[in-house]
């Protein structure tokens, strides 16, 4: 059965961590090197096919059947049934118990495997190929999770917690989902690393933005630290403080673009630019990690990913194994194969730009499952918890501060509840002191304080 590898991985993800031993982005952990088999006493089969020693049987709904997979019949219909208070995509919301010589057997007719697979693999994005926005992205508001009202819930993690609880009730020892953060990634995309640089930047400020000659000159040719968008020193101090005060592993990642012919990838820059060089010196002193910010040209032409990676590695003088797409513009699920082909093993693009929520149905890092081939790959997808532009931009959620804080804190707390990973994305141009119409400096600080409060290091009081 071609779905065997995928269903085995889903079971292991539901019943254990099933995440790489190293999630730093520095080491490739092969799916073959890391054993990820479900326990022998758990089976995904029809009740009559169960072995005598099977204590838990999850009954397939037919989703993976050849006649159904990839067809209209495989898509969930609204309204969804509920299983133990959770939306159920496939199967029947019931279970039954059966006494056997090996102990109580739990038969679950809710197809938790297919329901989890649908979310983790972005199956609907493969099926609805024509549902794309102007950047080729599948809109979050088109997703089943948004339309069914559970996008802000990590539903796969909820399934996992409830399944483990039920297994404990029949005397099986399972790994509990203890609250906490598996790790915290404080990420910053260098989309607009500076306000102005070079002669073209100077002329833009002078002629288009109508700045005075003195102001245009100061913003363009002065020291990098005097640039309007140079907020790096301040927020890196906050990140370092969070790393010191948080019990969970905390790291900072800068995602850096390479030059592109796409008009929306401007400004194009290289690390030789004097302002970029100053940013990089500061970042290296603060132990920042670097990833590839895949430009829109790479989104439209996945075969360009490898060249972009080689170019960035040459400029950095070090290898790069993690990435994020500019505009979060991952177009088709199978486009992720280009990352693997280029030697990228960790991606941080998995959030919707237009609405906050758990795009993959989980707060935990998970392997990319190709819904076309059903292959479980070596690429690790890190769910995006919060992005600044999603919250305030008029094209997206357009929230005021109070509502943005509520949404963002709730996402962080959900990740904590299920021992997930928090990944924050805040841009340097939104972390300014003197820009009162955008609230992200205040919000970013509030999120860092909450992370420390939930997972404080020993004998440390919050910020």
What spans do the regions from the language model cover?
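Terminal accessory/targeting
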Residues: 1-271, 364, 371-463
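Catalytic domains of cell-wall/extracellular-matrix polysaccharide-remodeling enzymes
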Residues: 25, 30-33, 297-376, 433-437
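Glycine-centered flexibility motif
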Residues: 171, 291, 355-359, 420
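Conserved acidic functional residues
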Residues: 189-191, 293, 345-349
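Long, K/E/R/D-enriched contiguous segments that form extended
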Residues: 216-218, 223-226, 235-337, 341
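Structured helix-beta-strand junction loops
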Residues: 285-286, 342, 418, 454
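Conserved beta-strand segments of alpha/beta enzyme cores
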Residues: 289, 345, 378-380
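Short acidic/histidine-rich active-site segments
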Residues: 293, 349-351, 425-429
